[in-house]
Protein backbone atom coordinates (compact mmCIF):
# COMPACT_ATOMS: atom_id res chain seq x y z
CA UNK A 1 0.00 0.00 0.00
CA UNK A 2 1.42 3.37 -0.99
CA UNK A 3 2.19 5.80 1.81
CA UNK A 4 0.27 9.02 1.86
CA UNK A 5 2.56 12.01 1.58
CA UNK A 6 1.58 15.19 3.38
CA UNK A 7 4.16 17.20 1.45
CA UNK A 8 2.74 19.67 -1.04
CA UNK A 9 3.91 19.51 -4.61
CA UNK A 10 6.87 21.80 -5.16
CA UNK A 11 7.51 22.06 -1.41
CA UNK A 12 10.90 20.37 -1.65
CA UNK A 13 10.70 19.41 2.02
CA UNK A 14 12.85 22.40 3.02
CA UNK A 15 12.89 26.19 3.10
CA UNK A 16 11.17 28.01 0.30
CA UNK A 17 13.26 29.96 -2.23
CA UNK A 18 11.97 33.17 -0.67
CA UNK A 19 13.03 31.99 2.76
CA UNK A 20 16.50 31.12 1.55
CA UNK A 21 16.84 34.48 -0.15
CA UNK A 22 15.71 36.27 3.00
CA UNK A 23 18.23 34.33 5.04
CA UNK A 24 21.01 35.21 2.62
CA UNK A 25 20.05 38.87 2.76
CA UNK A 26 20.02 38.81 6.56
CA UNK A 27 23.41 37.10 6.73
CA UNK A 28 24.84 39.52 4.17
CA UNK A 29 23.45 42.47 6.09
CA UNK A 30 24.91 41.14 9.31
CA UNK A 31 28.31 40.65 7.67
CA UNK A 32 28.28 44.17 6.23
CA UNK A 33 27.17 45.58 9.55
CA UNK A 34 29.95 43.72 11.35
CA UNK A 35 32.53 44.97 8.84
CA UNK A 36 31.27 48.54 9.16
CA UNK A 37 31.46 48.28 12.94
CA UNK A 38 34.98 46.84 12.79
CA UNK A 39 36.09 49.67 10.49
CA UNK A 40 34.61 52.27 12.82
CA UNK A 41 36.31 50.71 15.84
CA UNK A 42 39.72 50.78 14.13
CA UNK A 43 39.49 54.50 13.44
CA UNK A 44 37.90 55.23 16.84
CA UNK A 45 40.65 53.44 18.77
CA UNK A 46 43.47 55.20 16.91
CA UNK A 47 44.98 57.99 19.03
CA UNK A 48 45.58 61.50 17.65
CA UNK A 49 48.75 61.85 15.61
CA UNK A 50 51.72 63.65 17.16
CA UNK A 51 54.33 65.26 14.92
CA UNK A 52 57.68 63.45 14.95
CA UNK A 53 59.52 66.67 14.12
CA UNK A 54 60.80 68.09 17.41
CA UNK A 55 61.05 71.82 17.89
CA UNK A 56 60.03 74.52 15.48
CA UNK A 57 56.67 76.18 15.08
CA UNK A 58 53.39 74.35 14.48
CA UNK A 59 51.27 76.10 11.89
CA UNK A 60 48.32 75.49 9.57
CA UNK A 61 47.80 76.72 6.03
CA UNK A 62 44.10 77.14 5.14
CA UNK A 63 43.00 75.95 1.70
CA UNK A 64 39.53 75.70 0.11
CA UNK A 65 39.60 71.94 0.79
CA UNK A 66 40.89 72.02 4.36
CA UNK A 67 43.75 73.03 6.62
CA UNK A 68 47.29 71.86 5.86
CA UNK A 69 49.59 71.18 8.81
CA UNK A 70 53.22 72.21 8.61
CA UNK A 71 56.21 72.86 10.83
CA UNK A 72 58.73 75.64 10.41
CA UNK A 73 62.20 75.75 11.94
CA UNK A 74 65.57 77.41 11.47
CA UNK A 75 66.82 80.60 9.91
CA UNK A 76 68.18 81.13 6.42
CA UNK A 77 67.05 80.59 2.84
CA UNK A 78 63.70 78.78 2.55
CA UNK A 79 63.80 75.01 2.12
CA UNK A 80 60.63 73.01 1.47
CA UNK A 81 60.35 69.31 2.37
CA UNK A 82 57.59 67.32 0.64
CA UNK A 83 56.97 63.74 1.78
CA UNK A 84 56.04 60.85 -0.49
CA UNK A 85 52.53 59.49 -1.03
CA UNK A 86 51.22 56.22 0.39
CA UNK A 87 49.23 54.80 3.28
CA UNK A 88 50.46 56.39 6.51
CA UNK A 89 52.86 58.81 4.81
CA UNK A 90 53.55 62.13 6.53
CA UNK A 91 56.23 64.71 7.28
CA UNK A 92 57.57 62.24 9.87
CA UNK A 93 59.83 60.86 7.12
CA UNK A 94 62.07 63.93 7.60
CA UNK A 95 62.65 63.22 11.30
CA UNK A 96 66.29 62.15 10.87
CA UNK A 97 67.38 65.22 8.85
CA UNK A 98 65.03 67.90 10.20
CA UNK A 99 67.39 69.44 12.78
CA UNK A 100 70.49 69.26 10.59
CA UNK A 101 68.80 71.07 7.71
CA UNK A 102 67.30 73.73 9.97
CA UNK A 103 70.80 74.75 11.12
CA UNK A 104 71.31 76.66 7.88
CA UNK A 105 67.85 76.99 6.32
CA UNK A 106 64.35 78.03 7.22
CA UNK A 107 62.82 74.60 6.78
CA UNK A 108 59.14 73.99 6.05
CA UNK A 109 57.81 70.44 6.29
CA UNK A 110 54.14 70.01 5.43
CA UNK A 111 51.68 67.15 5.58
CA UNK A 112 49.98 67.04 2.20
CA UNK A 113 46.19 67.21 2.19
CA UNK A 114 44.86 63.77 3.09
CA UNK A 115 47.94 62.82 5.13
CA UNK A 116 49.41 63.19 8.60
CA UNK A 117 47.90 65.98 10.69
CA UNK A 118 46.37 67.81 7.71
CA UNK A 119 42.66 67.64 6.93
CA UNK A 120 41.52 64.63 4.90
CA UNK A 121 38.43 65.64 2.94
CA UNK A 122 36.52 63.14 0.86
CA UNK A 123 37.62 64.37 -2.56
CA UNK A 124 38.31 62.82 -5.93
CA UNK A 125 42.06 63.33 -5.55
CA UNK A 126 44.13 63.93 -8.68
CA UNK A 127 47.67 65.07 -9.39
CA UNK A 128 46.32 68.56 -10.00
CA UNK A 129 45.11 68.78 -6.39
CA UNK A 130 48.67 68.42 -5.17
CA UNK A 131 50.21 70.60 -7.85
CA UNK A 132 47.88 73.41 -6.83
CA UNK A 133 48.47 72.82 -3.13
CA UNK A 134 52.27 72.90 -3.36
CA UNK A 135 52.16 75.93 -5.65
CA UNK A 136 49.86 77.86 -3.30
CA UNK A 137 51.90 76.85 -0.26
CA UNK A 138 55.11 78.14 -1.84
CA UNK A 139 53.57 81.45 -2.86
CA UNK A 140 51.57 82.17 0.29
CA UNK A 141 53.67 80.60 3.05
CA UNK A 142 57.23 80.66 1.72
CA UNK A 143 56.44 83.86 -0.21
CA UNK A 144 58.45 82.88 -3.26
CA UNK A 145 57.71 83.20 -6.95
CA UNK A 146 56.56 86.26 -8.87
CA UNK A 147 59.97 87.88 -8.47
CA UNK A 148 60.07 87.55 -4.67
CA UNK A 149 62.84 84.98 -4.56
CA UNK A 150 63.11 81.22 -4.81
CA UNK A 151 63.06 78.23 -2.46
CA UNK A 152 65.08 75.06 -2.43
CA UNK A 153 63.03 71.88 -2.27
CA UNK A 154 63.57 68.24 -1.31
CA UNK A 155 60.80 65.89 -2.37
CA UNK A 156 60.24 62.14 -2.44
CA UNK A 157 58.94 59.83 -5.17
CA UNK A 158 55.63 61.01 -6.67
CA UNK A 159 55.89 64.34 -4.85
CA UNK A 160 59.25 64.84 -6.56
CA UNK A 161 57.45 64.51 -9.90
CA UNK A 162 55.01 67.23 -8.82
CA UNK A 163 57.91 69.50 -7.93
CA UNK A 164 59.48 68.91 -11.35
CA UNK A 165 56.22 69.85 -13.07
CA UNK A 166 55.84 73.01 -10.97
CA UNK A 167 59.42 74.06 -11.63
CA UNK A 168 58.54 74.46 -15.30
CA UNK A 169 55.10 75.98 -14.84
CA UNK A 170 56.84 78.83 -13.04
CA UNK A 171 60.65 78.72 -12.96
CA UNK A 172 60.68 81.55 -10.40
CA UNK A 173 59.44 79.32 -7.54
CA UNK A 174 62.30 76.86 -6.99
CA UNK A 175 66.05 77.37 -6.96
CA UNK A 176 67.55 73.93 -6.39
CA UNK A 177 65.71 70.62 -6.64
CA UNK A 178 66.67 67.53 -4.63
CA UNK A 179 64.64 64.63 -6.01
CA UNK A 180 64.57 61.39 -4.01
CA UNK A 181 63.73 58.33 -6.14
CA UNK A 182 61.50 60.46 -8.41
CA UNK A 183 58.74 59.03 -10.58
CA UNK A 184 57.11 60.44 -13.68
CA UNK A 185 59.18 59.03 -16.54
CA UNK A 186 59.11 55.25 -16.22
CA UNK A 187 57.05 54.86 -13.04
CA UNK A 188 53.64 56.37 -12.17
CA UNK A 189 53.54 58.29 -15.44
CA UNK A 190 50.56 56.77 -17.27
CA UNK A 191 46.89 57.74 -17.22
CA UNK A 192 44.31 55.54 -15.45
CA UNK A 193 43.12 52.50 -17.38
CA UNK A 194 39.68 50.87 -17.39
CA UNK A 195 40.85 48.26 -14.90
CA UNK A 196 42.47 50.82 -12.61
CA UNK A 197 39.29 52.90 -12.66
CA UNK A 198 37.46 49.80 -11.46
CA UNK A 199 39.94 49.60 -8.59
CA UNK A 200 39.06 53.17 -7.68
CA UNK A 201 35.35 52.35 -7.59
CA UNK A 202 35.94 49.29 -5.40
CA UNK A 203 38.04 51.21 -2.89
CA UNK A 204 35.49 54.03 -2.77
CA UNK A 205 32.62 51.61 -2.15
CA UNK A 206 31.14 51.97 1.36
CA UNK A 207 32.32 49.36 3.86
CA UNK A 208 34.08 47.20 1.25
CA UNK A 209 36.58 49.91 0.32
CA UNK A 210 37.29 50.84 3.93
CA UNK A 211 37.73 47.18 4.83
CA UNK A 212 40.29 46.75 2.05
CA UNK A 213 42.07 49.89 3.19
CA UNK A 214 42.21 48.68 6.78
CA UNK A 215 43.70 45.41 5.57
CA UNK A 216 46.42 47.22 3.61
CA UNK A 217 47.04 49.72 6.40
CA UNK A 218 47.01 47.20 9.24
CA UNK A 219 50.15 47.02 11.36
CA UNK A 220 51.07 43.75 9.69
CA UNK A 221 50.43 45.17 6.22
CA UNK A 222 52.48 48.29 6.95
CA UNK A 223 55.35 46.32 8.47
CA UNK A 224 55.49 44.00 5.48
CA UNK A 225 55.36 46.88 2.98
CA UNK A 226 58.11 48.81 4.75
CA UNK A 227 60.36 45.75 4.90
CA UNK A 228 59.75 44.50 1.38
CA UNK A 229 59.28 47.71 -0.62
CA UNK A 230 60.65 50.81 1.14
CA UNK A 231 63.44 50.01 3.61
CA UNK A 232 66.56 48.10 2.55
CA UNK A 233 67.50 46.86 6.03
CA UNK A 234 64.50 45.10 7.64
CA UNK A 235 66.02 45.56 11.10
CA UNK A 236 65.44 49.31 10.75
CA UNK A 237 61.68 48.78 10.51
CA UNK A 238 61.05 49.28 14.22
CA UNK A 239 57.80 48.99 16.14
CA UNK A 240 57.91 52.77 16.55
CA UNK A 241 58.15 53.30 12.79
CA UNK A 242 55.24 50.94 12.15
CA UNK A 243 53.19 52.66 14.85
CA UNK A 244 53.85 56.09 13.32
CA UNK A 245 52.64 54.95 9.90
CA UNK A 246 49.67 53.08 11.39
CA UNK A 247 48.45 56.01 13.49
CA UNK A 248 48.87 58.40 10.56
CA UNK A 249 46.98 56.04 8.24
CA UNK A 250 44.01 55.76 10.59
CA UNK A 251 43.30 59.38 11.36
CA UNK A 252 39.71 60.25 10.34
CA UNK A 253 39.56 60.33 6.54
CA UNK A 254 42.94 58.62 6.18
CA UNK A 255 41.49 56.24 3.62
CA UNK A 256 40.44 58.95 1.16
CA UNK A 257 43.61 59.33 -0.95
CA UNK A 258 44.66 55.71 -1.47
CA UNK A 259 41.97 54.89 -4.10
CA UNK A 260 43.31 57.65 -6.37
CA UNK A 261 46.91 56.58 -5.77
CA UNK A 262 46.29 52.90 -6.53
CA UNK A 263 44.23 53.65 -9.63
CA UNK A 264 46.67 56.09 -11.22
CA UNK A 265 44.79 59.36 -10.79
CA UNK A 266 47.80 60.83 -8.96
CA UNK A 267 50.22 59.85 -11.74
CA UNK A 268 51.95 62.51 -13.79
CA UNK A 269 54.27 62.36 -16.80
CA UNK A 270 57.11 64.85 -16.34
CA UNK A 271 59.50 63.66 -19.07
CA UNK A 272 59.20 66.88 -21.08
CA UNK A 273 59.38 69.12 -18.01
CA UNK A 274 62.51 67.41 -16.72
CA UNK A 275 64.26 67.95 -20.05
CA UNK A 276 63.68 71.69 -19.70
CA UNK A 277 65.24 72.16 -16.25
CA UNK A 278 68.26 74.40 -16.74
CA UNK A 279 69.60 74.53 -13.18
CA UNK A 280 71.36 71.40 -12.01
CA UNK A 281 68.85 69.03 -10.32
CA UNK A 282 70.13 66.44 -7.86
CA UNK A 283 68.79 62.89 -8.04
CA UNK A 284 69.23 60.89 -4.83
CA UNK A 285 68.61 57.16 -5.04
CA UNK A 286 68.90 54.33 -2.57
CA UNK A 287 70.96 51.51 -4.06
CA UNK A 288 68.39 48.91 -2.94
CA UNK A 289 65.26 50.88 -3.92
CA UNK A 290 62.50 48.50 -5.01
CA UNK A 291 59.40 50.53 -5.91
CA UNK A 292 61.43 52.87 -8.11
CA UNK A 293 64.74 51.06 -8.69
CA UNK A 294 68.00 52.92 -9.20
CA UNK A 295 68.03 51.72 -12.82
CA UNK A 296 65.26 54.24 -13.46
CA UNK A 297 67.78 57.03 -12.90
CA UNK A 298 69.14 56.36 -16.38
CA UNK A 299 65.94 57.68 -17.97
CA UNK A 300 66.26 60.91 -15.98
CA UNK A 301 69.93 61.33 -16.88
CA UNK A 302 69.19 60.73 -20.56
CA UNK A 303 66.36 63.25 -20.44
CA UNK A 304 68.53 65.90 -18.79
CA UNK A 305 72.33 65.52 -18.87
CA UNK A 306 72.57 68.46 -16.44
CA UNK A 307 71.19 66.27 -13.66
CA UNK A 308 73.53 64.86 -11.04
CA UNK A 309 73.03 61.43 -9.47
CA UNK A 310 74.00 60.46 -5.93
CA UNK A 311 73.45 56.81 -5.00
CA UNK A 312 73.21 56.06 -1.27
CA UNK A 313 74.46 52.62 -0.31
CA UNK A 314 72.50 50.34 2.02
CA UNK A 315 69.30 52.31 1.48
CA UNK A 316 66.00 51.79 -0.27
CA UNK A 317 63.30 54.27 -1.24
CA UNK A 318 63.92 56.50 1.79
CA UNK A 319 67.69 57.13 2.04
CA UNK A 320 67.08 60.13 4.32
CA UNK A 321 65.42 57.74 6.78
CA UNK A 322 67.92 54.87 6.58
CA UNK A 323 71.19 56.71 5.98
CA UNK A 324 70.68 60.32 7.12
CA UNK A 325 74.39 61.14 7.40
CA UNK A 326 75.16 59.91 3.89
CA UNK A 327 72.08 61.73 2.61
CA UNK A 328 73.14 65.00 4.24
CA UNK A 329 76.68 64.59 2.93
CA UNK A 330 75.26 64.49 -0.60
CA UNK A 331 72.66 67.21 -0.21
CA UNK A 332 74.39 69.90 1.86
CA UNK A 333 77.15 70.76 -0.68
CA UNK A 334 74.61 70.75 -3.49
CA UNK A 335 72.39 73.28 -1.73
CA UNK A 336 75.29 75.35 -0.40
CA UNK A 337 76.69 75.84 -3.91
CA UNK A 338 73.68 77.98 -4.73
CA UNK A 339 73.63 79.94 -1.47
CA UNK A 340 74.50 83.64 -1.78
CA UNK A 341 77.66 84.92 -0.10
CA UNK A 342 77.21 86.24 3.47
CA UNK A 343 77.47 89.86 2.33
CA UNK A 344 74.77 89.30 -0.26
CA UNK A 345 72.58 87.64 2.36
CA UNK A 346 72.94 90.65 4.64
CA UNK A 347 72.06 92.99 1.79
CA UNK A 348 68.98 90.93 0.94
CA UNK A 349 67.91 90.94 4.59
CA UNK A 350 68.33 94.72 4.76
CA UNK A 351 66.24 95.21 1.63
CA UNK A 352 63.55 92.90 3.02
CA UNK A 353 63.51 94.76 6.34
CA UNK A 354 63.25 98.12 4.58
CA UNK A 355 60.36 96.84 2.47
Language-model features, listed with the residues they occupy:
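Alpha/beta-hydrolase fold catalytic core
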Residues: 2-79, 103-105, 142-147, 336-355
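Conserved HGGG/HGGXW glycine-rich cap/lid loop of the alpha/beta-hydrolase fold
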Residues: 72-117
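Conserved catalytic-core motifs of eukaryotic protein kinase domains, centered on the activation segment
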Residues: 91-93, 118-123, 189-191, 294-295
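Active-site loop/oxyanion-hole signature of alpha/beta-hydrolase fold enzymes
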Residues: 109-154, 329
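Conserved hydrolase catalytic core segment
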Residues: 147-192
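Conserved alpha/beta-hydrolase catalytic His-Asp/Glu region
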Residues: 188-189, 193, 214-276
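Conserved loop-alpha-helix segment in the C-terminal half of the alpha/beta-hydrolase fold
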Residues: 277-315
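Catalytic active-site module of serine/aspartate enzymes centered on a nucleophile-bearing elbow/loop
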Residues: 305-355
Amino acid sequence: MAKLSLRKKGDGGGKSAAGKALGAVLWTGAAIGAAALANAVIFYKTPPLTSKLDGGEIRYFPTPDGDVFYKKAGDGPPLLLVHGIGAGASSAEWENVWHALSEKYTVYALDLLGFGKSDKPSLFYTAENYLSLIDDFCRQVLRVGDGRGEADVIATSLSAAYVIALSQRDPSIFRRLVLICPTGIEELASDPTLSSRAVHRIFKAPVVGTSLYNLIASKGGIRNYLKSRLIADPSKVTDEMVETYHVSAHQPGGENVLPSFLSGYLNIDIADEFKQIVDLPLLVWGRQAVETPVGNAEAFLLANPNAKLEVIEEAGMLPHVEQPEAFLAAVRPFLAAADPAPAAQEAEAAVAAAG
